[in-house]
From Swiss-Prot:
Pathway: Cofactor biosynthesis; ubiquinone biosynthesis. InterPro entries: UbiD (IPR002830), UbiD-like_C (IPR049381), UbiD-like_N (IPR049383), UbiD_bacteria (IPR023677), UbiD_Rift_dom (IPR048304). This is 3-octaprenyl-4-hydroxybenzoate carboxy-lyase. HAMAP family: UbiD. Keywords: Cell membrane, Decarboxylase, Flavoprotein, FMN, Lyase, Manganese, Membrane, Metal-binding, Ubiquinone biosynthesis. One of its GO terms (cellular component) is cytosol. PANTHER family: 3-OCTAPRENYL-4-HYDROXYBENZOATE CARBOXY-LYASE-RELATED (PTHR30108), FERULIC ACID DECARBOXYLASE 1 (PTHR30108:SF17). The active site is at D287. It comes from Shewanella baltica (strain OS195). It comes from the Bacteria.
Length: 493
């Protein structure tokens, strides 16, 4: 099942008990965050606040608050099915020629999907049913959440920022938080390595002093939103990838003030520009780390047009100490990364980004070890292969007999298969998230790799321990007589 817009997905979630409407007048200032946080931690439904206090526009939160809902957004029943998305991405990153007739036949579905990429331009789009310009532009009329007591101002969190570099044929979609600065101004917090910031830097170099056109889409269809947070190959647009996932082309329309294309069924569109000379102090804000971050200067986005659907819905979220919605997205996208990593490193058995690690700061990888030093090769490869992992501070490598998603297993491997000096890799002066205040320098810090695999000859001179395992025949016998023993419940082993 595919969803043409956010509303059809909302209806689907509600029909399946995955969305709750709240008619009580809840304040976007702090109250929505407290409610959303309690519900998310209880693995509860998405929430639609129909009557936000002092506003007339409903607010949707916790849309992707469970891995199940992320899978549902892509028409899947189980988060494990998201590995199909990873297989598609692995194919697109490095398509291999067919090895023969049978292989060519097997690859036909992927080739057919790849031909269905270009977005489809439509006229009279829903996102432009209502048009506001000039003095009508007033961002304070939107029910923008003020998430935490120490936040400096309300914050736009789920906007898809659409940019285009002067030397690029494709647009970029990225999600960057935006601080409300005034009736028609937001602060665009994009870090220097992100797609939007790179496009802006190229534009400034080629057209110094000129205004840079930018568009922000709020409440796009769920597949396009997820396309913007997926590791799409640099040569492919997020619109094209969303079309692949959806099975039909993404509908777009031209913005009113520039040539950028926007998702046609979006709830709200903000159009405007960035003056390269206008910067403002952004923050502090509570972030996905569970702390308030430092302030810094970022470009100011001046909004010249607001267009939206009739009876528009404002899509929002909050970030805080895990679990939060970004952490749940990370758990779901974990399944996407597995096939991509396996294509480059077939010896990888499984890969896990624990949500407690703030979505990406720690990774655990299980491998089929084949030679001394193998674990170190894999950890180096993981750090360098995908841009998404350059901020991963800790990587733990375990053998295939260890469940890398079970902390009891992982800690057992670390404490029994590691010598701290021999099996720890430290790398200094590497890229680190600017939000990581634990690093000695903003944006630059160290990484640690932990080799918790069994050690081979060459890695140790000692006789290595053999794990204790019960005789399978004894286990089968005890299983067969368990009920006769009078012990209440058989523990899961």
């Amino acid at each position: 099942m595919s969803f043409k817009d956010l509303r059809s997905f909302i209806d689907h979630l509600e029909a399946n008990g995955e969305l709750k409407r709240i008619s009580y007048p809840v304040d976007p200032h702090l109250e929505m965050t407290e409610i959303a946080d309690r519900v998310l931690r209880a693995k509860g439904p998405a929430l639609l606040f129909e009557n936000p206090k002092d506003h007339h526009m409903p607010v949707l939160v916790n849309l992707f608050g469970t891995p199940k809902r992320v899978a549902m957004a892509l028409g899947k029943d189980d988060p494990l099915a998201l590995r199909e998305v990873g297989e598609l991405l692995a194919f697109l990153k490095e398509p291999e020629p067919p090895r023969g007739f049978k292989d060519a036949i097997a690859k036909i579905p992927m080739f057919k999907q790849a031909l269905n990429m270009p977005p489809k331009t439509v006229r009279n789009p829903p996102c432009q049913q209502v048009i506001k310009t000039g003095d009508e532009v007033d961002l304070t009329q939107l029910p923008i959440q003020h998430c935490w007591p120490g936040d400096v101002a309300p914050l736009v969190t789920w906007g898809l920022t659409i940019t285009k570099g002067p030397r690029k044929s494709r647009q970029n979609l990225g999600i960057y938080r935006q601080q409300l600065l005034g009736k028609n101004k937001l602060i665009m917090r994009w870090l220097s390595h992100r797609g939007g910031a790179l496009d802006f830097a190229d534009f400034k170099q080629q057209f110094p002093g000129e205004r840079y056109p930018v568009v922000v889409a709020l409440g796009a269809d769920p597949v396009t939103i997820l396309g913007a947070v997926t590791p799409v190959p640099d040569s492919m647009s997020e619109y094209a990838f969303a079309g692949l996932l959806r099975g039909e082309r993404t509908e777009v329309c031209k913005a009113l003030s520039c040539d950028l294309e926007v998702p046609a069924t979006s709830e709200i569109i903000l159009e405007g520009y960035i003056d390269p000379e206008e910067l403002a102090e952004e923050g502090p804000y509570g972030d996905h780390t569970g702390y308030y971050n430092e302030t810094d200067k970022f470009p100011v986005f001046t909004v010249t047009h607001i267009t939206h659907r009739k009876d528009a819905i404002y899509h929002s979220t909050y970030t805080g100490r895990p679990p939060d919605e970004p952490a749940m997205l990370g758990v779901a996208l974990n399944e996407v990364f597995v096939p991509i990593l396996r294509k480059q490193y077939p010896e990888i058995v499984d890969f896990y980004l624990p949500p407690e690690g703030c979505s990406y700061r720690m990774a655990v990888i299980s491998i089929r070890k084949q030679y001394p030093g193998h674990a170190k090769r894999v950890m180096m490869g993981a750090w360098s292969f995908l841009r998404q992992f350059m901020y991963t501070k800790f990587i733990v490598i375990v053998d295939e007999d260890v469940n890398c998603r079970d902390w009891q297993d992982v800690i057992w491997a670390i404490t029994t298969r590691m010598d701290p000096k021999r099996d720890t890799v430290m790398i200094e002066n590497t890229p680190i998230d600017y939000l990581d205040f634990a690093s000695p320098v903003a944006g630059l810090g160290s990484k640690m790799g932990l080799d918790a695999t069994n050690k081979w000859e060459g890695e140790t001179n000692r006789e290595w321990g053999t794990p204790i395992v019960m005789d399978p025949k004894v286990k089968q016998k005890i299983d067969s007589i368990w009920d006769e023993l009078g012990i209440d419940d058989s523990p899961t082993l």
